[in-house]
């Protein structure tokens, strides 16, 4: 007897439907799975056999053939256990085939018939809805993320016999639903705040400008000056995630299996801070069957690289593509997958190996060649993609001891949102430009025009401060963002003057 049942698998951050065909015939007992299964799928035979027996159902001593279609795409993971078991029970007559119409099954079985959570429940549910599927049955531990998708019934189950009873009408299950409005009411309730940081007003201002224009930023300063503390609070001043952004971010975390079981939707901007020993595959994604990396986990959020020169050079170089394209392409011999990676880069570094090159209170013990070698670890092409460089001085005792309240993240965020709204309106006719950092040379010439005073100021700065040619466009972009924060239609000399301050690493001081 033959049964056909629907399941699904992930491909990149999306999913595709898989038809599980089960054929049972009177021949020498055996269990074969075809359709390019990986080792985890092949092992389903043992899990399904034990789960059926331990759930109290009769296991057929016949030849069983399972085909996973389409057969030309490799299937991986243990999520096919439940559909294979249901298909087998249907083929042997324990479940009526008409009960399986417009239903997707998903879940890993333990040997006693209980269901374990699976990766990718959210993108699979989204794909099922697109294809007109009416319901999805999956482990209760994976049902919370799936329940955010509307217009499809999501049933969370705990064991195999519960699914069989539900399909046969002897057990009632209630679809799980999540309230999007309730979830988004909790948005922006961060436990960190910029008001926690004493002093460093210039650095806070630079971070506000970076957030307002989506500019990448690097902070240079001695140990203990607060670089990491400031970077961790950067997401608190970014605009709230839209529903589409939250959905895309959650899908990435879902397929990687790092989404919390009680999280229906990620509503806070991600903040990822990989250690400097991270490999290039872990940073941008990789593996024999490609998986997303840290740059994708930081999608619509912040990627923070602390101690930037300590990262391996090849690791830093692979950052160039995602910084330029906001996407990562991972190619293998038989497939090529694309993962979104639209993040803000925030980096921090000491000015030299000992850390005290720019500290007026402590003597630097590094020789000039040592400092030059240390700085050379960051390539020009990577630095070229970072718009704002800001020096972070050591905090003075007077600032640490002050009782005066500092500005809260919410107030800064309101200014950032207003500046972003101006940019969205400015670039509404462009498909791939949403903020000032996205501008190319053509857009910079159009939207960042300077008056005579501004031109003279920039020319003098380029000459006297020894700024590089690549700093020119960066200064104009940042000037435009500062003007947007001030709600100024024109880029004024004071905006240019402030932007010039944010090119620390282009100065002659760092080149010798």
Predicted regions and their residues:
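Peripheral, non-AAA+ core regions of ATP-driven protein-machinery
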Residues: 1-218, 222-225, 266, 331, ...
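Basic, amphipathic alpha-helical bundle interface domains used for macromolecular binding and assembly
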Residues: 34, 40-45, 58-60, 67-77, ...
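Residues immediately C-terminal
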Residues: 111, 303-304, 310-311
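P-loop NTPase nucleotide-binding/switch module
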Residues: 171-209, 213, 240-295
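Walker A/P-loop
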Residues: 219-260, 325
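The Walker A (P-loop) glycine that initiates the GxxxxGKT/S ATP-binding motif of P-loop NTPases
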Residues: 221, 285, 307
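Walker B catalytic acidic pair
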Residues: 300, 306-307, 318
């Amino acid at each position: 007897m033959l049964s056909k049942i629907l399941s699904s698998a992930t491909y990149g951050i999306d999913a595709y439907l898989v038809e599980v065909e089960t054929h049972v015939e009177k021949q020498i007992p055996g269990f074969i799975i075809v359709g390019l299964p990986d080792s985890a799928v092949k092992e389903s035979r043992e899990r399904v056999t034990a789960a059926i027996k331990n759930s109290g159902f009769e296991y057929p001593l016949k030849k069983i053939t399972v085909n996973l279609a389409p057969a030309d795409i490799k299937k991986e993971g243990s999520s096919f256990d439940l559909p294979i078991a249901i298909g087998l029970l249907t083929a042997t007559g324990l479940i009526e085939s008409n009960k399986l119409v417009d239903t997707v099954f998903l879940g890993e079985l333990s040997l006693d018939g209980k269901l374990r959570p699976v990766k990718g429940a959210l993108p699979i549910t989204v794909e099922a809805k697109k294809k007109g599927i009416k319901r999805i049955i999956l482990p209760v531990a994976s049902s919370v993320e799936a329940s955010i998708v509307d217009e499809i019934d999501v049933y969370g189950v705990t064991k195999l016999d519960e699914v069989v009873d539900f399909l046969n009408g002897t057990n009632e299950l209630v679809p799980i639903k999540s309230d999007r409005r309730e979830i988004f009411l909790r948005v922006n309730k961060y436990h960190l705040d910029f008001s926690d940081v004493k002093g460093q007003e210039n650095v806070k201002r630079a971070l506000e400008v970076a957030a307002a224009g989506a500019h990448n930023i690097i902070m240079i300063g001695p140990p203990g000056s607060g670089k990491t503390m400031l970077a961790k609070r950067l997401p608190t001043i970014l605009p709230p995630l839209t529903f589409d952004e939250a959905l895309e971010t959650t899908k990435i975390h879902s397929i990687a299996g790092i989404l919390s079981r009680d999280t229906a939707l990620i509503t806070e901007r991600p903040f990822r801070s990989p250690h400097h020993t991270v490999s290039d595959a872990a940073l941008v994604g990789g593996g024999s069957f490609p998986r997303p990396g840290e740059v994708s986990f930081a999608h619509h959020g912040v990627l923070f690289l602390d101690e930037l020169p300590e990262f391996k050079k090849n690791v830093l170089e692979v950052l160039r593509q995602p910084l330029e394209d906001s996407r990562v392409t991972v190619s293998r011999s038989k497939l090529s997958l694309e993962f979104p990676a639209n993040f803000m880069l925030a980096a921090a570094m000491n000015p030299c190996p000992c850390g005290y090159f720019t500290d007026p209170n402590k003597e630097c013990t590094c020789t000039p060649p040592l400092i030059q070698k240390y700085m050379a670890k960051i390539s020009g092409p990577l630095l070229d993609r970072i718009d704002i460089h800001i020096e972070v001085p050591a905090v003075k005792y007077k600032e640490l001891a002050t009782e005066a309240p500092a500005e809260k993240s919410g107030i800064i965020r309101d200014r950032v949102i207003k500046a972003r709204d101006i940019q969205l309106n400015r670039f509404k006719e462009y498909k791939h430009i949403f903020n000032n950092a996205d501008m190319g040379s053509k857009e910079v010439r159009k939207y960042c025009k300077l008056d005579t005073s501004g031109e003279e100021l920039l020319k003098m700065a380029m000459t006297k401060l020894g700024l590089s040619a690549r700093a020119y466009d960066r200064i104009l972009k940042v000037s435009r963002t500062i003007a947007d924060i001030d709600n100024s239609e024109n880029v004024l000399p004071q905006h240019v003057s402030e932007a010039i301050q944010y090119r620390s690493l282009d100065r002659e001081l760092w080149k010798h």
